[in-house]
Amino acid sequence: MIQQESRLKVADNSGAREILTIKVLGGSGRKFAGVGDMIVATVKQAIPGGNVKKGDVVKAVIVRTVSDVRRADGSYINFDENAAVIVKDDKSPVGTRIFGPVARELRDSDYMRIVSLAPEVL
């Protein structure tokens, strides 16, 4: 579960390395976000020459969480880290590559571009 002030690794080549959650989008008073949810975040670490800079406010989609995600068949999946992909307003990724696996739940959430760029979908 991702909440305000959570730090996440960035799983794309947009230039950001780490982001800090400012707000969970999707309703007033919503506290937590899971895989496939969109957040507003600020860039805390960035590499030189990237598309985003330190201090930029960006939107991101969560692709991996440490907390379990329950699937319809009753199974659970979790990852070793919390990670997100920075996206534009039209839900397309800023970067051109995705690093690491992403959860299958993104397929149901209009993020097929992220799923197609990912090296592995779990």
Curated annotation (Swiss-Prot):
Source species: Leuconostoc citreum (strain KM20)
GO MF annotations for this entry?
Answer: large ribosomal subunit rRNA binding; structural constituent of ribosome
Protein keywords: Ribonucleoprotein, Ribosomal protein, RNA-binding, rRNA-binding
Identify the Pfam families for this entry: Ribosomal_L14
Q: Where is the signal peptide?
A: none
Among the GO biological process terms of this entry, one is: translation
What's this protein's function? Answer: Binds to 23S rRNA. Forms part of two intersubunit bridges in the 70S ribosome.
**What is the name of the protein in this document?**
Large ribosomal subunit protein uL14
Q: What quaternary arrangement does the UniProt entry report?
A: Part of the 50S ribosomal subunit. Forms a cluster with proteins L3 and L19. In the 70S ribosome, L14 and L19 interact and together make contacts with the 16S rRNA in bridges B5 and B8.
InterPro entries attached to this UniProt entry? Ribosomal_uL14 (IPR000218), Ribosomal_uL14_bac-type (IPR005745), Ribosomal_uL14_CS (IPR019972), Ribosomal_uL14_sf (IPR036853)
| GO CC, one annotated term | cytosolic large ribosomal subunit
Q: Of which family is this protein a member?
A: Belongs to the universal ribosomal protein uL14 family.
CDD domains found in the cross-reference section = Ribosomal_uL14 (cd00337)
